[in-house]
Structure formats: C-alpha cells, structure tokens
C-alpha cells in the first residue's frame, strides 16, 4: 500500500501543501494503481460539508470530461463514511483533477491507491497443527488444548480477507456472508480467508469454537486487492458491528502492504468504533513500522512464532508489534472441506482475533481494550524476538492461572482432532 507517486511534478506537491491538502509521496517498491487515488477529508468534517465536497468533485470531473476533452476517467468510485473517524473517497482521476482536489482546504491528504496482499507464505501437507495447544498451555510441546466451554459464544468475528467457505463443516452454520468489495464471486476462491476463519471459529481448529464468523471479501482469487477496496470492507464491518453490538465484535485483517496513512486511519476508525481489530505484522522480516495497517498504534499487531517459541524467520518485528502468536505450519480449514497447512503472520493473527472473541464470551470485556488484556495474559517466552520487539506470546489463561474464576475447562487431544 502506498502514497501518491513522485511522477506528480514537485511544483504541484509544494503548491498543494500551501493551498490545501498534503500530497504524499510513494515509497520505493510500492505497486501503485495507475491514476487511482484515495482522498481523505479533514478531521471532524460534517456530513453536510462532505456531501457538498463530493458534489463539487463530481461536477468538476464531468466538466473536465465534457469541456476540456480530458482523458476518460471513472471519477469517484467509493465513498468512506466511518461512524467515527475517517471520511473520504477513492476514484480514477487524472493529474489535473488531483491538482484541483489538492487545492481544497477541506482535504487532509491524498495518496495513490496501491496493491495489498495476504500474508501467508508457505504450504505443507499432512502436518498436525500445534497452535491451539500452545495458546492453552504455558509450556511448548503440548498436545492438549484447554479452554472454557463458553468458547466465544455470543461474539462475532469479521474476517476481512479472500472470503470464507461458509458451508464448511467447521463452522456448523455459524458462518455467514457479509459483503464483497473486490469481484462478483461470493466465495473463497483462494483459501486464505477460510483458513483464517477456521483458526478463529472452527469447531476443530478454532480458538473461539462457538463464535460467529462473517466473511468480508476484499481480496481476489490471487490474494490481491487495493487499498480502496480494503477500506470499503473495513467501513462495512464497522457499521455492521455497531448495528449488532460492537462490544461483541472482533475483526481480523491478515493482509497488508507498504505504509499507507489512509489504511492506518481506517484501522483507527474501526478501533474508535468500538471493535477489537487484530492485524498481521507482515512477512518481510523487517520492522513493521513501514507496513500498513500493522503500524497503526491503536490496533493489535501480531507477529508469528514457531513451535519452539522462537520468532518465525519471515515475521516482521518492531515496537509496533503487540504480541506474538503461533504462525508457522498452522492447520486449518480449506474451501470445499478438509484442511490445509499454511504459515505466515496471516496465520498468527486469527489466533489473536479468536482469543479476543473467546474473552468476549467469558465476559472479560470488548473493544480495542482487549489488546491490553491479551498482552497482560501473554507469557514472556519468545526467543530472539527482533530489535525493540516484545517477547510476549498469547495465552488464553487456562493454563497459567490468570483468569480468577472457575472455568468449565474442556480439553482436546490432537489424536482425536486429526484422527492420527
């Protein structure tokens, strides 16, 4: 994910800072989308003023197309109106139109739309998963998952991803289709989103086995999408969660890209809306401060650990990381039935979202404050976590005496789970 490219003349960038919006430069290596932009409005803008601005954009864009013979562009495509926080829009504009928009005093900043992608990197067949056992134990190497029988009941997890196979037997009818902002196929044609959903709420693979799962599709069959489409999914999930009870909701984003202020602002708006959000730190073995939305400080950023409690060699790190979670060779659901093994911070993140849903089911709070609770419950075991990075690994409390009330503890043996 990235900012507006350096191809725009320096004089234009300088003028826009003086007269109105800041036009952000694109960082090296960012895969931007030609002539597509995200425009973010000033904080506190009223709906009336926002509607007035949008009308001006549409009028000006049409006038350019008709009177000036400008190159055909699609104009405004998506409008963002989060319940709290970010207001803005994205669209297809030429350089001159962006110049006009940048002069407006009511625009906060503009960035170029860019590609985002899933954060799974490896696949391995026929390997039993270990992540659940690690979440429920204070020592590595366990084969039993201990958890309270509430198991996230009453919570809802929004999986902002490639979609979810809602008919998969893992979900027992608890998964529903929410919205699609990337294509016309309401299905998971990639497999990533179903795997993530299974780790959150699957009956076999899930941390919160009784939670509800809502599929929000923002990535295509190749696991790729755009900042603008992802932000649409984030907005939809926030509004839907608020209608149903934000304090009972968690959101998972096992995706990311290069730094994007718009993506970070959208993530912050989810948190401001009262929803707990877990985000993947990324798989480039670099500081996650340069990744989005992982670098947004108000959400819960997750790095990936190995079965031996080490940092996974691919995992990003840094001060923005809140916790580690199992992310190497994780078994979960795949579309059409059965399971597959994937690795990545994408696989670590749903362990944290699932733990958030689990704690909601236990009545231990809700909203963005769950990240602090999860950090307090975490155990200090990660070896060589990376420069300026926490060594905390998540734990559900059942094995370390953190939760100070009787638990209806269940245990699951891997031999039963996987028919080994």
Swiss-Prot record:
Primary residence: secreted
GO terms for MF: serine-type endopeptidase activity
Compartmental location: Secreted
Enzyme class label: hydrolase
Keywords: Glycoprotein, Hydrolase, Protease, Secreted, Serine protease, Signal, Virulence, Zymogen
GO biological process: proteolysis
Glycosylation sites noted in the Swiss-Prot or TrEMBL record: 222, 252, 396
Domain Inhibitor I9: 36-118
Cited Pfam families: Inhibitor_I9, Peptidase_S8
Peptidase S8 domain boundaries: 129-413
Coiled coil: none
Superkingdom, natural source: Eukaryota
EC number: 3.4.21.-
A GO cellular-component term linked to this record: extracellular region
Signal peptide interval: 1-20
Maturation propeptide residues: 21-119
Catalytic residues (UniProt): 161, 192, 346
Keyword presence, Ribosomal protein: no
Family: Belongs to the peptidase S8 family.
General function of this protein: Secreted subtilisin-like serine protease with keratinolytic activity that contributes to pathogenicity.
Name of the protein in its database record: Subtilisin-like protease 7
Organism: Trichophyton verrucosum (strain HKI 0517)
Lineage summary: Eukaryota, Fungi, Dikarya, Ascomycota, Pezizomycotina
Gene that produces this protein: SUB7
